[in-house]
Amino acid sequence: MKNKRFLFIFALICITIFCIIYYIFLKFGNNNSKEKIVDEILNSFNVYEADVTVTVYSNKNTNNYYMHQIVNHKVSRCIINEPEDINGLNIELNNGKLFIKNEKYNIEKVYENYSEVLNNSLFLNTFSDDCINNGYKLKESEENEVNNNENKDEIIIETILENNKNTYIKYKELYVDINNRIPKKLIIKDDKQKIYTSIIYNNVKIK
């Protein structure tokens, strides 16, 4: 009788230990798998094309811009489609220089230190660099939290620019479709976590 009881307790302990080890392994495996996927996603932003809708928020009004982005490693270019008054404006970042062109208004300028003129946070490769330099963490989407969605088709990659002197650009959150690994939107927040810029991505082509 004592032997049977001992064997039962021993078996119960073994099962409990197995369950704990399995849970830890499963959790670690999922986290490791997600981190690997995120690294692959961030590395894919070096070469891509996309149609983007940029919304800039301020205390007084909201401005929308529609543009096409072309990124090839260190060369980042966007062509403004709307609003109409700046249609055709071509902005290119190349080797630390900013090129601004608009044939309609016969404009062509080159700035040696573009960081003082234009922040290049609009581009996905800049987001990748920010994650490399500042680290990142994965957040749960509000939809998954509310609906307790176990599929989790969307992941949110957040990076915090602690040393950025521009108080309007402190937090960045990139929403990515986990199935096709295509970015959906980028939210940029100020130092008070108020949304400063929203960027919606359409027709994204990762090359």
Which functions belong to the PLM regions below?
Residues 68-122:
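An acidic-aromatic
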Residues 2-74, 205-207:
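N-terminal leader/targeting segments and the immediate start of mature chains
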Residues 136-207:
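Gly/Pro-enriched, hydrophobic low-complexity segments
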Residues 45-49, 69-76, 92-97, 150-152, ...:
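Short, solvent-exposed coil/turn segments at beta-strand boundaries
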Residues 61-67, 85-93, 167-169, 194-197:
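Amphipathic hydrophobic-ligand
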Residues 115-116, 120-129, 135-136, 140-141:
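C-terminal low-complexity, charged extensions that often adopt amphipathic alpha-helices
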Residues 58-60, 71-73, 82-84, 178, ...:
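A generic beta-sheet turn/junction motif
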Residues 54-56, 80-83, 100-104, 161, ...:
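Beta-turn initiation residues at beta-strand->coil junctions
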